[in-house]
Amino acid sequence: MKRIIAMFCGLVTMLAFSFAVAAQTTRSVTVVLQDSSSGEPVGYATVSLTKAGANTASKYALTDDKGKAVLDKVSAGSYTVKAELLGYKNYSAEITVKNSVDLGIVKMEPDRKVLDAASVTAAGNPIIIKKDTIEYTATSFKTTDNDMLEDLLKKLPGVEVGSDGSVTANGQTISKITIDGKTFFLDDPQLASKNIPAKIIDKVKVVQKKSEQAQFTGIDDGQEETVIDLSIQKGMMNGLFGNVQIGGGHDWPENTTNGNGDWRYQGAGFIGRFTEKSQLSIILNGNNTNNRGFNDLSGSMMRSMRGGGGGMGRGGGGWGNSNGITTSWMGGVNGSWDLFGDKMDLGANYLFNGTQKDVKEISDKTTFLDDGSSLIYHNDGYSFNNSYGHRFGMRLEHKFSEKTSILFQPQFNFGNGDFQEFSKFTTDGIAAGETESVAKNEGFNNNTGNNKNWTANGFLLFRQRLGLPGRTLSFNIDYNFSNNDLYGFNQSLTKTFGATDAENVNAIVNQRYDQNSKSSSVSGRLVYTEPLGAGFYLEANYQYRWSKNKSDKLTYDSADRGAYDFNADTHEYYRETDMYDKDGNIIYVDGKPVHSNEVLNSQYSSNILNQYQTHRAGVNFMFQKDKIRAQVGASIIPTITHNETNGKSYDNSVINWSPTAMLWYDINDNMNVRGFYFGNSSQPTTTQLMPVPDNTNPLNVSLGNPYLKPYFSHNIHTRYGFSNRQKFLSVYANLSGGFVQSPIVYASWYNTNGTAFSLPVNGPTSGNVNARMFLNAPFGKSNFSISSSTSGSWSTSTSYVGKSSFDTSTYYVDGDFDYVKFHNDFPDLGKSDKFLENNTQTMNFTERLKLTYRNNFVEIIAGGRSRIAKSWYTIESANTNVTRNNQASMSMNWTIPGGLGLVGEFNYNWYKGYKTPQDDEYVFNLEITKLLFKNQCTLSLKGYDLLNQSKNLSVSDSSNYHTETWNNTLGRYVILSLTWRFGNMNNASKGMRGRGPGGPGHGPGPGGPPPMM
């Protein structure tokens, strides 16, 4: 006891001493730097303090985006304060520090000699790397008057825009886009990228943004995201501006296979008013050219309820976002205001959107089994999906004082939708050593339904500074609630062929199902930070998270299934009267409502409850001095899981611990290095835990697994940035990797009829490594510049494939899958004699190279890219080839005297190494524009894919299967549009005139083999 008391007293004494030391160093020197000519803040300048009589500085700080720098823990005495930044004359002054000193605003005088020496006439792509920010000067990249932000982003080195509209920067997905630091429509970057005119943008900044709580405490919590922050041109401020576009066109020649008509239309509008204190934007968009200008949250929720078994997903193409023809429309308003003398920052937005998607698909899949036999699947089908949604969002930040503030950000989503999917299928088998196929089965499946959903999520953050600089207390609450209802009909007929016609068996499914899924989660995180002196800080944190997911599904069979007949001419099964129509209305048969004859099917019904409780307690130590900052820490994470499935309970508890380590090192003003490590525990989804077969696709039955355990991820990330501001040379590189303990993988097997089954299980550790580097540089003071992007990745994962000796019927009792028996028989699938463990290793290498010539009238870009991929499988039935996806491209953007403009794009794609040879592809887009009415309007005629060669065939190969999938897609079409610009849109810097939204570069990319990543 005495020893414990002595240790406690010693600890108290040490803490008291550290507080006393910290109290003696509370003086600070504050300064704000501004350009003497423009009054703009001078960011990222070096401010230093040199004690009288000393030769070297004792304190350093960099100014932030607002030009402010604070040097903390300054001892009393006389100092020389200096401010330095390339392009400005050095500032120097003598000061005496007795208490904290505020130097106010210091005007930095531009150094004309340096600026003249560093100037490059229209050269290349000016990029500056500042700590965790990559800044692009938008006016250095040629865009047309009608281009959207998405067109500008495609020109930025290191930034990529996917065919689905997603944006990545240096391999990191962009989670949101802000305007001058203010969120634009919260967490939907597509709304900004597809609807904000490129002409109004001054700067594009790619920022590694920490969580709001980490920004306040200064200690990283691992919740980092990559965002894009836009700066608006000064000419667009303090006035109304906008543009409106309308256009129409036609497929050429007429395309009767897309199922959505041959006429093309597009309409878009953007109205904005921006000041230093407020932002207001109104956006409108509608088209049937696959240019959806928003993230379809309602459609995503509907798809998540249906799981992975529906549709034609086994064909490899599925009903994915890049397939088919999409018609979309939306309208929204976004605003933000600085109120009460900048003490309150208020933002709000509303959006309505709708999507109609039409997909046709034909797929063939060959599966190679371990006994030398193979199965050949053929599918032919279509799907129609409609979704509609409303979104409301708000962001409120209020500063009660310099020490106390709150941040509240709620969001609400309401949506509904409906779907119809139909496909015909056949399965043939080829025995080992044989060449002739034998029919296994044939049939069709038809799925219809509708969905209603809503979500409410957000967070509340309270922040408090406690006297000493660096001593803080913050508390954050996150919440997420959702409700999802799905009402559907599942109808199928599968005829399994026997040795004779008398042995043929028809399996009929005629079901109606009602499914409801509710989820609730609340978490709270308390963080306390304490300065320990000499640049050391301590953080203690505690987080509690509770979540509850409840899913109820009731499935009913029709007691009177009726008779199906086969039409030999159309190769279709039919009934004289269907049980239900596509809208879910009851069909009367012989005067009796089918609904009255329904019988509950317990095998496909379920009642599931999942509850999780996670505690996370951690300690972090941080050291910060001059140009280096380091952080180490650890957390202990006990997790309790409770699952109830159809009255049976499953409980599990696990304790994980997570070390963290981070390093920030600013080598100099132009070069920096970052390194991070984080660990995180995650839970299986409700769908993965649901022990109910999904028979939406009768030949591809997916099962859940109530025995799944949480998995733990380890992640490492490093970054390097270099920028030479005189030569406009920029280099950025990152290396990341990680591994997952007990990852969720899949076990799959086939029965004798060719039906595939899949079951999620916890597998052995998986891992991945990714590397990426980009370089951008001009050629001296010429109009040429070059950019290069190189990336590579490696990953390893495991799956399990059932042997031919595995008897599926052993685990079906009265039609129900026996999870207990399966779990007891196969506690470790890797050691089972009924399953093969397949380890997959995949390696990819991609190189992009682009040469740009640019002057005031024309921009010409020539480039190429090549993606090389190779996979290795431990159970491969044949050697896998090295596949190569290659592209050579050229584009021109030419402003012609007289208000004319010419924009052309040409891509040549060729593919090597695929089992099915792929034809070369030539895609040519062309647009002609004319300025009208004192340059306030632009008339545009554009043609997409003029050679009509866009592919709609995709090919994929894996360890034991080969898949080819055909989908409908947009082909060649022409469209005539008129764009009107008004207000301050004509005050922005003059760019090159040309295309508007929906033209070349906006439509769907080629289907083809897997895209180059």
PLM regions and their residue ranges:
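Face-selective signature of the C-terminal outer-membrane beta-barrel domain
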Residues: 3, 24, 343, 347-351, ...
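Membrane-proximal, glycine/serine-rich, low-complexity loop/turn segments characteristic
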Residues: 23-24, 66-68, 89, 112, ...
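Short, ordered, surface-exposed loop/turn motifs in non-cytosolic proteins
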Residues: 27, 37-53, 127-129
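Short, acidic Ser/Thr/Gly-rich low-complexity loop/linker segments typical of extracellular
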Residues: 52-69
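A short, solvent-exposed loop/turn motif at the edges and junctions
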Residues: 53-56, 78-94
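Extracellular/periplasm-exposed beta-strand and loop segments of Gram-negative cell-envelope proteins
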Residues: 295-297, 315-326, 359-367, 375-389, ...
